[in-house]
Amino acid sequence: MSFDTPLKPYLAIPIQDCGEPLAPINLEGVKSLKPHPYAQVGADYQGRSPYVLRTGVLKRLDQARLTLADIEPSWEILVFDAYRPIAVQQFMVDHTFAEIVARDGLQGQVLTPEQKENIYHQVYQIWAVPNNNPLTPPPHSTGAALDITLLDDLGQPVDMGGEIDELSARSLPNYYQTVEPNSDRQRKEFEQYQRRRELLNTIMESAGFLRHPGEWWHFSQGDQLWAWQYNQRHPDHQKIAYYGRVE
C-alpha cells in the first residue's frame, strides 16, 4: 500500500472471537467454482481451501439455501469465494492494481504519487486492506464472509447485471434503481436485475446475513462489517464481532 488509507468505520468494532472452527462448504443446493477464480490468476492458497466457513456461518448458509428452495425450487446458490488468507488478499490487491494500470494504458514503473493514490482508491472500493493487525482483519479472512450469486434451473449463473468483483457503479446493490433506462426493453432488464439482487439479499438476510453496502454479492455474519451494519439498524441493541481473523 503506497498511501495512507483511512480505516473503514466498521474496523472500529471490537472483536471477541467465539473460537468456532472452519468447516468445508458441503451443502446440498450450494455449488462452488472449481478451479477457484483467484487461483486461476496465480493466488497461492498454500494447500488450503477457499471454500470453508465458520461452522455457525455454514449453518446459516444452509438456512438461506432452504429459503431459496421455497421461492425458486430449481435454483441453487453458487459460492464464488469464501475464506481468504491475508496473503491471498494481498495478491488480489496487487493483481487488481496491475489490471487497472494496464486498462488505463499506464506505465507501472513511472506512476506519479497522484496516479498511485487514484488507483489504490479504486482498488479499495472492492478489496479490503490486507491488514495483518488482528484488530482489523479483512472480512474474508475471518471465515464469516462469502461472495455468492445464483444458479438457474439449468445450472447456469443468473444474470445479475454485473460481475462479481467488478470495478464499476454496477456493483452497488441498488444500482439499477438509480439509472434511467433508455427503452422499455432496457427498463424490463433493469427491473429483472434488481429483482434478482433483492432475491439474493432476501434469502441471505432471512438467515441472519447482511450485505456489503457496496457489493451486491458479498454477505457476512458475525464479523466486524456485519456488527457495524447491525448497529446502524439497531442503535439501542449494539453488538460486537464474534468472528476475527482465523488461520
UniProtKB/Swiss-Prot annotation:
This is D-alanyl-D-alanine dipeptidase. It is found in: Cytoplasm. It holds the Pfam family Peptidase_M15. SUPFAM superfamilies: Hedgehog/DD-peptidase. Its cofactor is Zn(2+). CDD domains: D-Ala-D-Ala_dipeptidase_like. It comes from Synechocystis sp. (strain ATCC 27184 / PCC 6803 / Kazusa). The keyword Chloroplast does not apply. Keywords: Cell wall biogenesis/degradation, Cytoplasm, Dipeptidase, Hydrolase, Metal-binding, Metalloprotease, Protease, Zinc. It catalyses: D-alanyl-D-alanine + H2O = 2 D-alanine. GO terms for molecular function: D-Ala-D-Ala dipeptidase activity; metallopeptidase activity; zinc ion binding. The keyword Hydrolase applies. Belongs to the peptidase M15D family.
